[in-house]
């Protein structure tokens, strides 16, 4: 999966509550995908917009990071 495919999935499935590499402060209850240098970072935030302890995973491969990001986002949206 690449970024365009991930965005299409998000739109098609009407997924909400995410930050996909946006330069802004975290918001409450969202799944975050950030690129830092050559690494992809995926984590979740809580009701106070703080990073959830032990939720961060680091990937060297964009596809793996996007798969994890979409999986978490789908799970998060099922809980809403």
Predicted segments, located by residue:
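Negatively charged, low-complexity tracts enriched in Asp/Glu with abundant Ser/Thr
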Residues: 1-25
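Intrinsically disordered, low-complexity charged/polar segments
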Residues: 75-80
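Short aromatic-glycine-(Arg/Gly/Cys) micro-motifs in beta-strand/loop hairpins
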Residues: 27-54, 72
């Amino acid at each position: 999966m690449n970024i365009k495919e991930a965005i299409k999935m998000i739109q098609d499935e009407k997924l909400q509550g995410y930050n996909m590499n946006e330069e802004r402060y975290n918001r409450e209850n969202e799944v975050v995908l950030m690129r830092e240098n050559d690494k992809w970072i995926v984590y979740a935030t809580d009701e106070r917009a703080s990073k959830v302890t032990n939720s961060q995973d680091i990937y060297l491969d964009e596809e793996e990071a996007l798969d994890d990001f979409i999986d978490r986002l789908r799970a998060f949206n099922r809980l809403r």
